[in-house]
Amino acid sequence: MSHNAPLVLMILDGWGYNENDRYNAIAKANTPQWDEWWQTCPHILLKASGLPVGLPDEQMGNSEVGHMHIGAGRVIQQDFTRINEAINNGKFAKNAVFHEVIDQLKKTEKSLHIMGLLSPGGVHSHEQHLFALLALCNQKKFRSVHLHLFLDGRDTPPQSALDSLKCLNEELAKHPVATINSICGRYYAMDRDKRWQRVEPVYNLLTQGKSERQFPDAETAIHFYYKNKISDEFVPPTLIGKEHSIQDGDAVLFFNFRADRARQLTSTFLDPSFKGFERKTLPKLSYFVSMTQYDKNLFTTTAFPPVPLNNTLGEVLSSHGLSQLRIAETEKYAHVTFFFNGGCESVFTNEERIMVPSPQVATYDLQPEMSAHELTKTLIAAINSQDYHVIICNYANADMVGHTGNFEATVQAIECLDQCMQQVWQALKNNGGKLLITADHGNAEEMFSEATNQAHTAHTSEPVPFLYVGGGWHFTHSEGSLIDIAPSLLALLGITPPPEMTGRILLEKNHAHA
């Protein structure tokens, strides 16, 4: 590969492979470029869920986990698995952070406010982690606990909150330490695109008890919203029972383990230079506990601190003096940077980053192309500049539009991506470059669930494609997993993968006399 003929690793977020074309937006879409490649270019399928990506067996993959494994080239035990193991082996109940906080609150006679996504989804949180916290509070005879619950409907069926509430009420019967004081859809509480108009009413509910509506219990509220065609994700910030807002001296515990959708709400409490909206009140908290580290610049007390990773793909490229570009639209920018670098905030030498703003629409089925065309233009300019040896880019459409459950819009998103891929390859071909295409997890290939008779808005456990365009190389294995991508990419560059990368090299140069 010549000095400035770029190698592009294109990650099609949420583009899984499913032989069944029923409810499959990828199969339904008109994709002439993809179809041509699938017939003529070397490709295999990669596992992107469960144990091969450090998750519990059969747990669907997700963007954070996918990008970490693509970048790391080894299996990383995910925070979800770490916390599950800690619960099972008793270490969770002995966690020093939890004990310190509860002991302090008992002394000061203040309250603990536990907030997070009440969901069995296992993508951003898991309700079992909340239940373990309730058991610990009960064990320590601490009963001043208020729950502020965010509803899912995105990594779970759109109307599934009542099932989770039933489980929670069973736990509260066993461990009567807490009351449910508010509910709110994740659309508001877990925004990650600086749409502060969504987050502000959540903050006002938590800190002042302000809410358009108040209900005696969460079930009554949810039935009301369902009757008005509002599913879990979109339930507005709602007060439940008596108002118990967060006061000076209280502690907050955010039990989500995934960082990207926890940062904004956390910053409303902790960021000294916060400018998202005017905060009418700012409680002086004794602690703000986060299950994991959300951001090194947000000084939370972290229950499960990060485990550092060395020699990720970005670091190896940098140490070999190669220039790299990371490019994505807002929705997936953290994934091709922070998560791809193993949860490391720092930027490597010769690593550049470009973020293309995601469109400001309520849901992405209203604009299925999202910012793919703008991203493509920027990507082509970067290829033509010949400034980069490696470009790592993410197209968000299959995932973000797939999450809406809107089949036709997702088909449009896939067709838009096919056009973008064709344009990117044209530019690469003109510059003598190579293209690797893969995905972080599935989504758009399964858009309806016959089991729930609802739109399938969550990720899937299907494998993802791994396709090589550029000639001269072939795959040596019939299947692999996400951890094999980094070693294979390094092989294309003539670099020996470091020993930390336990993934396999799946590509081999064609021999002249084959």
Curated annotation (Swiss-Prot):
Substrate binds at residues 124, 154-155, 186, 192, 258-261, 332. One of its GO terms (biological process) is glucose catabolic process. One of its GO terms (cellular component) is cytosol. The active site is at 63 (phosphoserine intermediate). Mn(2+) 1 binds at residues 399, 403, 459. Its cofactor is Mn(2+). SUPFAM superfamilies: 2,3-Bisphosphoglycerate-independent phosphoglycerate mutase, substrate-binding domain (SSF64158), Alkaline phosphatase-like (SSF53649). Belongs to the BPG-independent phosphoglycerate mutase family. Monomer. HAMAP family: GpmI. This is 2,3-bisphosphoglycerate-independent phosphoglycerate mutase. It comes from Legionella pneumophila (strain Lens).
